[in-house]
C-alpha cells in the first residue's frame, strides 16, 4: 500500500514537470481543439514524433519526448516510423528445435562482422546555451508539513531544458568514449509550480465530544399503542361514610293480614319410607385408559405401497474429491457481447534482443530536422572506481491513502461496548406499550378495621337447624258457654299437632317474602376473599424517566474472536489518475485464447413481477372451544434462540467505562513452517508493445446459471456508468409478503422411504372396564413423517414473548433501506491497544488523509504483485539503463519470426559442468520417424555427473493443471525403462532425420518397478500411412541395453489431449554425461517447465544509476508475518461461531421394564447415569453442534489464505496460489457450502415448525403433534411445552385419537397400608401429604428434572389447553371412600386437592365436585376394594391433583392406598 502511495506522489510530481506545454484551447463539449483538429476528453496524440499531447477536460497538455543519451546495445539501431527515439530492431527467430538427445547448447559465438555503415545524417545547427530562467514562485500547499522540503530527488529523474537552442553548425560526432564515472549529484531543480490538490485525507479521529446539545424539538406524535390488557380488578373500596338520614317516606297503604301464628312443636319422626325403584341407568362412563398391549397378531397381508416419502435432508458436504481429469473441449459458446473497453494494459516484459536485421535501403532524405540535442561530450578518461554506497535516504513523505478495499461482510454483532456517559435527559416519550401484568404481590399488613359495610344481599336459605326439644303441654281451659253464632272471626291459632303423617313429597319453593325491617348493624365482617381480576384499567400515564444506574465494573478483556469468513470481492475502484503514455513497446506475442469468463454479476433489479393470482382459500380448520382465561403462569425459562431481531433504536449513551487493565506479554509463537516458493523476480524493463493478437476463439461454455425468476421484459435502459458500491444499509424492516413465487424445480430423489402405513384399522371392540395404568411399553419405531395438515384459520396474535438470546449469525441479508441516523454517542475513553486482529477484508474507499510526517527509512518490502493498469500517461523521459533485472519467468511462446541470417560460427565452448539429474519425464507420445541422417563426429566424453540421493517416494498428489509452457530444459539422464504402455494411435510419418552422433554407452540402470498402465490416449489426427508391421506378442522386459544413437526429431506432431498424470517414478541413477554435440540452432521455446527452486543470492552488483520511477505495480503479495508481539491480555469472547454441521444422532436406548413398585422410601440421592442403551436405528438429523475450537493457524499473510481464495489450490499452493495453484474452481465450493448451509437451516426450521415428538425434536404438546403428523399412533412421545432448551423435554403419553397430552405421576401410587391412627371419637378429613407421617404430595413428570422445571412445563401446558381431566383410584380396607351404604349419604366421602389448592368434594358447587366411575368402598368388609374418582374441568389450572384427604380412617384395622392416574390436557 505504501509503495502505491509513493508512486501516486510521483505521478502528481510528473504533472508538475517544467517542460510541459500547457495550451488552453477552446473546449468542444468537454473535448479539445488543437492545430485545427478536435479531440475528445482524455485523447492522446502526437502532433510530431517527439511531442505528445493529451486532452484533459478542455485543456491541451503537450510535452517533448526526450530521448535517452545511452548507447543502445545493438550494431544498427533504428528509429521506427512515427517514433522519436532509436530502438534495437527485433530479429525474427527460427522455429527450430534442438534434436532430442543433443548435448547442451554451446557458448555464445563471437560477434559478427560490423554491418554496412548507415549514411550520415544532416548535421544539426548547434544552439547557443540559453540563459537560465528566473526561479519560479514557491509552491503553495495547504496540507503539506511546514519546514524545508527537498524535491530534488524527484526532479533529478527528469531532464530539464533550460533554454532555446540557436547557433552554428555542429561537426560530425566523434567516436563514443568509454563510459565515464558516475557524475556528481545535480543541482536542485527550480521550485515546481503549485501541485494539484492532493487526495482527500482520511477522516481524522473523532474529536472530543462536544457539550450536549439543547433538547431537540418534540417528535411527531407516534401512533396510538395497542389497547392494553385488562388490569386486575382493584381491591374493594372502603365503605363510604354513612349518609344523612333520608326524608320521611310517604305513609304506606294498609298492611295485609298478619302471618299465621307460631309454628307448633315438631312431631316425632315418621317411619322410613319404602325403598324407591331402581334409578335410571347412569350416563355412559368415559373411555377407560388404554389396556396393555395385546400379543402381536399374525402378520397381515402386505400393505399397499406407501406414498413416496419426502426427500430426506441433504447429507453433509463430502470431503473434497480429487480433481477430475481434464474434460474434452466443449462446443464453442455463442460469441459474447462486446465487453467494455478495458484500461490500457501494463507494459509487457522486455523481449529478447533479436539478431541484427539487414540494413535497409537508403530512405529519401527527410525534412530538415529540428536543432539536434547538444553533442556528445568529448572522450573521457577510463572509468573511476565505483563510489561507496550512499547512506539510505530518509523515508519519503507519506503518500495519499490507497484505494480502500471493498466493504467486508457485515460482521457478527460485537460485544456491548462500555457504557457511555449520561446523556442529557431526553424529552418525555409517548405512552409505552402496556406492560405485562405484574406478579401477585406479597400480602400487605392487616388493615385497620373498616367501617360497617352496606348490608349484603340476603343469603340463600340455610340448612334446617336441629330440632328443638318438645315443650310441655299447656293445661286445658274451662269450657265456655255457647254463644250466638257470631260473624266469622279471624283465623284462630293453630291447634295442637296431629299424629305425624308420612313424609310428603317436597313442595316447590315458595316465592320470596318481602324484605324484613332493617336489622341492627352487625359487627364488621372479616376481609373477604380477594375478588377475581376486574376489567383492565386504562393505561396509566407514563412514569418519569428513572435515575441512571451506577456504571458497572469494567469487564475483563475477552479472548479474540476467530477470524470471520472472507468478505466478498469489493467493487472495482475508481480509475486512477491518467498517466503519461509510455513509449511504444515491441510487438507482444499473441495471447492464448482466454477461458470463457464466469457468469457476469447480477444485472440491475428488474421491475417487480406481476402479483400471482390469489390462491383459493383453504378450508377453515376446526375452531376449538374458547377456554376460560387461565391464571398467569410463572415465567418460563429462557426461550430458544430466536432469529436475529431487527435493530433496535439507539440506546441512551452510557457513561464511559474505565480503561481495562493492560494485558500481559504473550509467549513467543512457534516457528513457522518452511515458506512457499518465492515470488517471481522483479519485472524486467518494459518491452515494445506488440501488435494486437488475433481474436481468440470462444471459450468453453460457462457453468449453467441458476434459474432466474421470469420477470417481465423491461424497457431497454441506457448504459449507465457503474457506481461505487454503497455501504450496506441498516437492516430494513420486514417487508410485506411478496406475491406467490414460481413453482420450484423438482427436488432430487429422496432417500428410501420408511415402511408404509399400517393396514386399515379393525372394528372397535366393546369397551372394557378401565384397567390400572400399565407399565410403559417399549418405544416403537418412529413412523414415517405424515403429510402436512390443512392450515387452520389464523389464530389471534399471541402475546409478545420475551426477547430471546441472540441467534447465530445469519447469512447477510439484502441491504435494507438506510435507517434514520442515530444520535452521536460521546467518545469513550481510549482502551488499551488490543492484539492485532487478522487482516480484515479491505474496507470501502476512504478519503485521502493529510500527509503524515516523514517516517524512518523502512526495510524494503517484498515486491508487490502488478497493480491494475492505470490510464495511459504522458511518456516519461527516457531513463538511464537500470541495473540488470533478475530473470523474469519465461513468457509464453512468441510467434515464429522470420529466419535471420546465419551468424559466423563461434569458437568451441568449454565442456560444460555436468547437469544435475532431471526428473524422469512422463513417457511421451511416439514421435514421427525421422529420416536417417549422416553420422556425426564423436565428441569427447564428458565428466560423469554426481549421483543424486534417491528421495522418499511422496504420497500421490492431486493431478495439477498443465503449467504454462516453459523453455526446453537440457536433456536429462537416461531413465529406467518402464513397462510398455498401451499402443498409441499411429502418428504422422515424419521425414527421416539424419543420424545423431554415437553417444557413449550409459551404465546399465536397475530395472524399475513396473508402472501402472497409463490411460489410453484419445486418437490423434490420422497420420500418413506408415509401413505397417505385424504386431508381435509382447515379450518380457529385457535388461536395458545401451542407449542407441538418437535421431533428429521429426517435426512435432499435433498435440494430443492431456492424459492424467501418472505416479511419479523414483529417480534413476545418473548416467555419465554424453559428449557435447555441436550447438544446434536455437529451438522454439518449449512448454514451461515446473517452477525452479529459488536460486542462491548472487553477489551484489555495482549500484546502477537510478532509473526513472516505474509505473505503479500491482499490490504486493502479503508480507511475511512480523515477529510475534508480546502476549496480549485475553480478549473478550468472540461471537459465537457458525453452528457446526449436523451430527449423526445416537439412537435411543430401549426402555427397561418397570419393576413392581416397592414401598415409598424417603427420596434418595440422585443416582449415577445409566449405561448406554444398545444402538438403535439413526434418528433424524440432529441440530448443529456447538462451535468447535479454533482451527490451526491458517496460511500466512492475508487472513484467509490465498489458497482458499484460489479454490483450495494444489498441494504447493501458497501466497501466490491464485496464479500457481490448482485449476480454477470458479468458486463453486462457496456456492455449494452456502446451499448446504441453507438446506441445513431449512431442515432445522422444518423440524422446528413440524416437530416429530422425538427427543431431538420435541413437540410443544400432543395436539400440535397430532396436527403435524396425523398418522402417528397413540403412545409415548417427547414434548417441551416451555419451548426452551430441549434438554428439559419430558416424555408423555399422547392420545392421538383426542390429542390429549397425559403426564404420569411420580410415583404412580401410594402403597396400601395403615397410614393414620386417631384415637379420638370425632373423625375428620386428614390430608395425606400434609398431615400423615410418611405422606407426600403427588408430583408429575420426569423425576430427573428439577421440580421447578416440571412446574414450568405444567404451567405452559395449562396455558396451551382448554380442558383437563384426571382420575384417582382409592384402594380401601374397612374405609369408606364415597357413599356410606349404612347411612345412604356421602358425608364420609374423601376430598381431593388441585394444584391451585382448590378442593374437590362429593357434593356442593358443581364446578368443584368430582364424579365416581366405580364405587367399591361403601362398607367395612375386611377385604380390599377400590373406588375410582374422576375430575374434569375447563379450568386447566386446577389440575393435576396433588393431595387426597380420606375421612373414614384412623382405626387399627383401616388401611388404604392410592393409584394416581395421569393428568391429561387438551
Curated annotation (Swiss-Prot):
InterPro entries from the UniProt entry: Collagen (IPR008160), Collagen_superfamily (IPR050149), Fib_collagen_C (IPR000885), VWF_dom (IPR001007)
Compositional bias ranges of the Pro residues kind: 175-185, 890-907, 1046-1055, 1181-1193
Region called Triple-helical region, residue ranges: 168-1196
PTM field: Proline residues at the third position of the tripeptide repeating unit (G-X-Y) are hydroxylated in some or all of the chains. O-linked glycan consists of a Glc-Gal disaccharide bound to the oxygen atom of a post-translationally added hydroxyl group.
Cysteines paired by S-S bonds: 1262-1294, 1302-1464, 1372-1417
Entry GO CC: collagen type III trimer; collagen-containing extracellular matrix; endoplasmic reticulum lumen; extracellular region; extracellular space
Protein name (Swiss-Prot/TrEMBL): Collagen alpha-1(III) chain
GO terms, biological process: aorta smooth muscle tissue morphogenesis; basement membrane organization; cell-matrix adhesion; cellular response to amino acid stimulus; cerebral cortex development; chondrocyte differentiation; collagen fibril organization; digestive tract development
Keyword set includes Secreted: yes
Span list, region Nonhelical region (N-terminal): 149-167
Amino acid at each position: 500500500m505504501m509503495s502505491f502511495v509513493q508512486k501516486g506522489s510521483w505521478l502528481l510530481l510528473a504533472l508538475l514537470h517544467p517542460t510541459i506545454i500547457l495550451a488552453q484551447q477552446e473546449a468542444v463539449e468537454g473535448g479539445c481543439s488543437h492545430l485545427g483538429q478536435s479531440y475528445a476528453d482524455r485523447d492522446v496524440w502526437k502532433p510530431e514524433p517527439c511531442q505528445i499531447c493529451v486532452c484533459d477536460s478542455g485543456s491541451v497538455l503537450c510535452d517533448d519526448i526526450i530521448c535517452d543519451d545511452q548507447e543502445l546495445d545493438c550494431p544498427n539501431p533504428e528509429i521506427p516510423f512515427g517514433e522519436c527515439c532509436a530502438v534495437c530492431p527485433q530479429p525474427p527467430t527460427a522455429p527450430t528445435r534442438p534434436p532430442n538427445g543433443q548435448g547442451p547448447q554451446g557458448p555464445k559465438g563471437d560477434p559478427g562482422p560490423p554491418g554496412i555503415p548507415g549514411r550520415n545524417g544532416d548535421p544539426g545547427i548547434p544552439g547557443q546555451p540559453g540563459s537560465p530562467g528566473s526561479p519560479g514562485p514557491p509552491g503553495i500547499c495547504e496540507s503539506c508539513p511546514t519546514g524545508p522540503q527537498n524535491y530534488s530527488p524527484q526532479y533529478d529523474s527528469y531532464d530539464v531544458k533550460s533554454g532555446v537552442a540557436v547557433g552554428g553548425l555542429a561537426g560530425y560526432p566523434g567516436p563514443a568514449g568509454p563510459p565515464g564515472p558516475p557524475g556528481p549529484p545535480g543541482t536542485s531543480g527550480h521550485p515546481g509550480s503549485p501541485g494539484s490538490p492532493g487526495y482527500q485525507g482520511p477522516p481524522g479521529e473523532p474529536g472530543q465530544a462536544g457539550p450536549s446539545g439543547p433538547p431537540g424539538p418534540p417528535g411527531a406524535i407516534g401512533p396510538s399503542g395497542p389497547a392494553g390488557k385488562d388490569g386486575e380488578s382493584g381491591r374493594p373500596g372502603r365503605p363510604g361514610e354513612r349518609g344523612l338520614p333520608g326524608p320521611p317516606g310517604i305513609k304506606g297503604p294498609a298492611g295485609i293480614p298478619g302471618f299465621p301464628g307460631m309454628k307448633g312443636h315438631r312431631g316425632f319422626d315418621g317411619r322410613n319410607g319404602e325403598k324407591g325403584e331402581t334409578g335410571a341407568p347412569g350416563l355412559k362412563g368415559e373411555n377407560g385408559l388404554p389396556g396393555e398391549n395385546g400379543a402381536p397378531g399374525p402378520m397381515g397381508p402386505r400393505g399397499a405401497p406407501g406414498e413416496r416419502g419426502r426427500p430426506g435432508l441433504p447429507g453433509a458436504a463430502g470431503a473434497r474429491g480429487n480433481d477430475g481429469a481434464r474434460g474434452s473441449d466443449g462446443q464453442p459458446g455463442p460469441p459474447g457481447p462486446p465487453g467494455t473497453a478495458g484500461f490500457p494494459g501494463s507494459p509487457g516484459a522486455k523481449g529478447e534482443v533479436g539478431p541484427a536485421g539487414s540494413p535497409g535501403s537508403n530512405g529519401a532524405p527527410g525534412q530538415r530536422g529540428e536543432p539536434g540535442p547538444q553533442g556528445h561530450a568529448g572522450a573521457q578518461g577510463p572509468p573511476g572506481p565505483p563510489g561507496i554506497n550512499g547512506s539510505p535516504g530518509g523515508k519519503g513523505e507519506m503518500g495519499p491513502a490507497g484505494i480502500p478495499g471493498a466493504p467486508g461482510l457485515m460482521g457478527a454483532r460485537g460485544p456491548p461496548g462500555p457504557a457511555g456517559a449520561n446523556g442529557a435527559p431526553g424529552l418525555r416519550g409517548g405512552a409505552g406499550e402496556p406492560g405485562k401484568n405484574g406478579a401477585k404481590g406479597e400480602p400487605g399488613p392487616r388493615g385497620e378495621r373498616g367501617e360497617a359495610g352496606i348490608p349484603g344481599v340476603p343469603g340463600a336459605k340455610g340448612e334446617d337447624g336441629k330440632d328443638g326439644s318438645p315443650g310441655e303441654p299447656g293445661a286445658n281451659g274451662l269450657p265456655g258457654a255457647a254463644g250466638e253464632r257470631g260473624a266469622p272471626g279471624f283465623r284462630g291459632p293453630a291447634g295442637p299437632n296431629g299424629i305425624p303423617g308420612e313424609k310428603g313429597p317436597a313442595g316447590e319453593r315458595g316465592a320470596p317474602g318481602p324484605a324484613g325491617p332493617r336489622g341492627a348493624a352487625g359487627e364488621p365482617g372479616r376481609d373477604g376473599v380477594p375478588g377475581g381480576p376486574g376489567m383492565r384499567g386504562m393505561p396509566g400515564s407514563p412514569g418519569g424517566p428513572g435515575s441512571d444506574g451506577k456504571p458497572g465494573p469494567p469487564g475483563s478483556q475477552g479472548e479474540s474472536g476467530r477470524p470471520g469468513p472472507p468478505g466478498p470481492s469489493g467493487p472495482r475502484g475508481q480509475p486512477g489518475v491518467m498517466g503519461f503514455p509510455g513509449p511504444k513497446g515491441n510487438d507482444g506475442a499473441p495471447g492464448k485464447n482466454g477461458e470463457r469468463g464466469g457468469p457476469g454479476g447480477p444485472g440491475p433489479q428488474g421491475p417487480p413481477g406481476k402479483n400471482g393470482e390469489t390462491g383459493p382459500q383453504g378450508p377453515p380448520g376446526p375452531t376449538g372451544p374458547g377456554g376460560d382465561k387461565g391464571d398467569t403462569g410463572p415465567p418460563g425459562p429462557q426461550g430458544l434462540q430466536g432469529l436475529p431481531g431487527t435493530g433496535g433504536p439507539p440506546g441512551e449513551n452510557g457513561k464511559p467505562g474505565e480503561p481495562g487493565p493492560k494485558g500481559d506479554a504473550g509467549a513467543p509463537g512457534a516457528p513457522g513452517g518452511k515458506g512457499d516458493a518465492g515470488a517471481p523476480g522483479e519485472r524486467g524493463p518494459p518491452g515494445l508493445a506488440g501488435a494486437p493478437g488475433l481474436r481468440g476463439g470462444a471459450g468453453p461454455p460457462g457453468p449453467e446459471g441458476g434459474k432466474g425468476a421470469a420477470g417481465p421484459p423491461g424497457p431497454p435502459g441506457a448504459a449507465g456508468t457503474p457506481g461505487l458500491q454503497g455501504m450496506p444499509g441498516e437492516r430494513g424492516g420486514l417487508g410485506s409478503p411478496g406475491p406467490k413465487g414460481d413453482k420450484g424445480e423438482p427436488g432430487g430423489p429422496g432417500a428410501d422411504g420408511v415402511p408404509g402405513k399400517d393396514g386399515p384399522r379393525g372394528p372397535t371392540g366393546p369397551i372394557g372396564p378401565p384397567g390400572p395404568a400399565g407399565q410403559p411399553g417399549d418405544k416403537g419405531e418412529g413412523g414415517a413423517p405424515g403429510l402436512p395438515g390443512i392450515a387452520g384459520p389464523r389464530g389471534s396474535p399471541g402475546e409478545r414473548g420475551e426477547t430471546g438470546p441472540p441467534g447465530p449469525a445469519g447469512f447477510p441479508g439484502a441491504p435494507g433501506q438506510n435507517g434514520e441516523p442515530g444520535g452521536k454517542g460521546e467518545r469513550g475513553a481510549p482502551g488499551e491497544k488490543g492484539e492485532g486482529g487478522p487482516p480484515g477484508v479491505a474496507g470501502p474507499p476512504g478519503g485521502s488523509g493529510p500527509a503524515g510526517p516523514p517516517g524512518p527509512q523502512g526495510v524494503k518490502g517484498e515486491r508487490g504483485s502488478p497493480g491494475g493498469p492505470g490510464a495511459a500517461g504522458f511518456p516519461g523521459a527516457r531513463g538511464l539503463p537500470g541495473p540488470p533485472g533478475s530473470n523474469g519467468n519465461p513468457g509464453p511462446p512468441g510467434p515464429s519470426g522470420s529466419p535471420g541470417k546465419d551468424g559466423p560460427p563461434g569458437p568451441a565452448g568449454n565442456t560444460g559442468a555436468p547437469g544435475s539429474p532431471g526428473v524422469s519425464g512422463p513417457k511421451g507420445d511416439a514421435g514421427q520417424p525421422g529420416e536417417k541422417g549422416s553420422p556425426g563426429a564423436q565428441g569427447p566424453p564428458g565428466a560423469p555427473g554426481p549421483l543424486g540421493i534417491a528421495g522418499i517416494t511422496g504420497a500421490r498428489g492431486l493431478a495439477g493443471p498443465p503449467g504454462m509452457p516453459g523453455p526446453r530444459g537440457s536433456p536429462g539422464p537416461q531413465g529406467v525403462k518402464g513397462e510398455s504402455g498401451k499402443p498409441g494411435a499411429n502418428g504422422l510419418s515424419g521425414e527421416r532425420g539424419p543420424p545423431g552422433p554415437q553417444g557413449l554407452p550409459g551404465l546399465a540402470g536397475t530395472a524399475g518397478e513396473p508402472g501402472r498402465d497409463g490411460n489410453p490416449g484419445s486418437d490423434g489426427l490420422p497420420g500418413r500411412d506408415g509401413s505397417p508391421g505385424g504386431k508381435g506378442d509382447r515379450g518380457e522386459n529385457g535388461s536395458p541395453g545401451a542407449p542407441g544413437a538418437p535421431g533428429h526429431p521429426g517435426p512435432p506432431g499435433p498435440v494430443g489431449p492431456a492424459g492424467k498424470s501418472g505416479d511419479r517414478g523414483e529417480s534413476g541413477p545418473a548416467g555419465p554425461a554424453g559428449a557435447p554435440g555441436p550447438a544446434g540452432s536455437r529451438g522454439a521455446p518449449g512448454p514451461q517447465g515446473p517452477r525452479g527452486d529459488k536460486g542462491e543470492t548472487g553477489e551484489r552488483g555495482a549500484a546502477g544509476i537510478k532509473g526513472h520511477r516505474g509505473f505503479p505495480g500491482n499490490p504486493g503479495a502479503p508480507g511475511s508475518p512480523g515477529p510475534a508481539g508480546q502476549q496480549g491480555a485475553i480478549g473478550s469472547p468472540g461471537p459465537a461461531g457458525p453452528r457446526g454441521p449436523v451430527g449423526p444422532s445416537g439412537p435411543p436406548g430401549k426402555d427397561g421394564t418397570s419393576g413392581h413398585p416397592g414401598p415409598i422410601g424417603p427420596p434418595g440421592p440422585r443416582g449415577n447415569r445409566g449405561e448406554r442403551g444398545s444402538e438403535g436405528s439413526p434418528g433424524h438429523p440432529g441440530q448443529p453442534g456447538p462451535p468447535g475450537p479454533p482451527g490451526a493457524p491458517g496460511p500466512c499473510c492475508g487472513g484467509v489464505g490465498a489458497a482458499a481464495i484460489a479454490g483450495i489450490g494444489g498441494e504447493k499452493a501458497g501466497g501466490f496460489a491464485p496464479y500457481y495453484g490448482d485449476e480454477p474452481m470458479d468458486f463453486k465450493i462457496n456456492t455449494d457450502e452456502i446451499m448446504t448451509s441453507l438446506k441445513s437451516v431449512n431442515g432445522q426450521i422444518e423440524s422446528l415448525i413440524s416437530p416429530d415428538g422425538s427427543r431431538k425434536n420435541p413437540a410443544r404438546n400432543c395436539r400440535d403433534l397430532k396436527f403435524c403428523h396425523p398418522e402417528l399412533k397413540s403412545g409415548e412421545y417427547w414434548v417441551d411445552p416451555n419451548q426452551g432448551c430441549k434438554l428439559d423435554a419430558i416424555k408423555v403419553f399422547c392420545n392421538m385419537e383426542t390429542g390429549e397430552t397425559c403426564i404420569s405421576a411420580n410415583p404412580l401410587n401410594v402403597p396400601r397400608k395403615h397410614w393414620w391412627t386417631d384415637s379420638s371419637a370425632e373423625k375428620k378429613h386428614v390430608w395425606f401429604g400434609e398431615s400423615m407421617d410418611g405422606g407426600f404430595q403427588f408430583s408429575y413428570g420426569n423425576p430427573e428434572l428439577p421440580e421447578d422445571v416440571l412446574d414450568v412445563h405444567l404451567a405452559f401446558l395449562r396455558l396451551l389447553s382448554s380442558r383437563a381431566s384426571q382420575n384417582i383410584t382409592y384402594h380401601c380396607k374397612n374405609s369408606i371412600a364415597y357413599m356410606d351404604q349404612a347411612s345412604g349419604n356421602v358425608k364420609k366421602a374423601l376430598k381431593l386437592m388441585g394444584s391451585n389448592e382448590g378442593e374437590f368434594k362429593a357434593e356442593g358447587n358443581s364446578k368443584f365436585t368430582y364424579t365416581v366411575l366405580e364405587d367399591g368402598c361403601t362398607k367395612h368388609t375386611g377385604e380390599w376394594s377400590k373406588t375410582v374418582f374422576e375430575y374434569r374441568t375447563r379450568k386447566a389450572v386446577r389440575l393435576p391433583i396433588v393431595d387426597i384427604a380420606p375421612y373414614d380412617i384412623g382405626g387399627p384395622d383401616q388401611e388404604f392406598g392410592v393409584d394416581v392416574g395421569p393428568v391429561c390436557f387438551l
